[in-house]
Amino acid sequence: MSSGSWSHEVAVNVAAGRMFKAAMLDWHNLGPKIVPDFIAGGSVVSGDGSVGTIREIKINNPAIPFSYVKERLDFVDHDKFEVKQTLVEGGGLGKMFECATTHFKFEPSSNGGCLVKVTASYKILPGVADESAKAKEGITNHMKATEAYLLANPTAYV
């Protein structure tokens, strides 16, 4: 079993607060609307959106080797636009990973947009290839889809 981590940054032309709300806090609702070819649905399994909340995202893409992801919110800072979440079920847990956490931080930039900083930490099970490049691509796609939606809908998530 090997441990690993990676960091990734995505620049977007939407304010940090709007991106944080749409891409993190409400992704289980927004994702299926804006990327239905990837996300079939989402829901809050337990909790109210604060620390300890568990959310489920159902995957609708045969290229992904799992059909859903359940994540627990471990840290939420509405003022600094930060979220840390832990994979608790699905998403390759037990098949690809022993454990995985992801930390997102949305930092305002001088152009009115923001820089999304992501750090993932994980333990890969023996014999499983590290696919961090695919994970980074997925994060970029997630943020760019959210950005496109928010630019097209300027009153959403204000």
Swiss-Prot record:
This is Pathogenesis-related protein 1. Belongs to the BetVI family. It holds the Pfam family Bet_v_1. GO terms for cellular component: cytoplasm; nucleus. GO terms for molecular function: abscisic acid binding; protein phosphatase inhibitor activity; signaling receptor activity. InterPro entries: Bet_v_I/MLP, Bet_v_I_allergen, Plant_def-hormone_signal, START-like_dom_sf. It is found in: Cytoplasm. It comes from the Eukaryota. The keyword Cytoplasm applies. It comes from Asparagus officinalis (Garden asparagus). Keywords: Cytoplasm, Pathogenesis-related protein, Plant defense. One of its GO terms (biological process) is defense response. Induction: By wounding and elicitor treatments.
